[in-house]
Amino acid sequence: LWDELLNKLTFDELKNLYNNGAFRTIAIESIGKPATLESDGPVGFTNFMSDAEIYGTTAYPAEVVMGSTWNAEIVQEMGECVGEEGILGKISARSQTPYSGWYAPGINIHRSPFGGRNYEYFSEDSFLSGKLAAAEISGANSKGLYTFMKHFALNEQETNRDDNGICTWATEQAIREIYLKPFEMAVKEGNAHGIMTSFNRIGTH
């Protein structure tokens, strides 16, 4: 089915879709695809790309706070609430289009207490992170909001992370059992549909 859909698109349609894809996707009339809006981040819809105001959204607790609750049910409810806000439509002063996608949740591991984005990630525990991510994604999905779990993978350091990609080294066992486990759980249990990659270069030995 996916191949059939792609085969219906022209080269120019594919090129325009890829080249105009940050925080939105363009409409493609030939296949009836509507334009979409997507927003960052893990504490709800935000707009750090411009000075435009956002209306009708909530600033939710940071994921590290949600992780401290150990409560998947309340995290799922938060996902449902964000999904409801996405449906509302009049979020941006520039647009009536509701948000279709959400760049969240952040499900990397607290490898160090000095991690620059630990507040965006649930825990140092891979199982807890996976359970809560799956719950949040499931809640958002139930309202028609697709999510981009992030940052895949081993994105536990902000310093130098996007200057040609920091080199991250780990054993295969650590990668599988600790760092990839939350992403696996989010897909298998939460039915995640999207992913945001990290900039780092990953090596093992």
Role assignments for model-derived ranges:
Residues 1-205:
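Glycoside hydrolase catalytic-domain context in secreted enzymes
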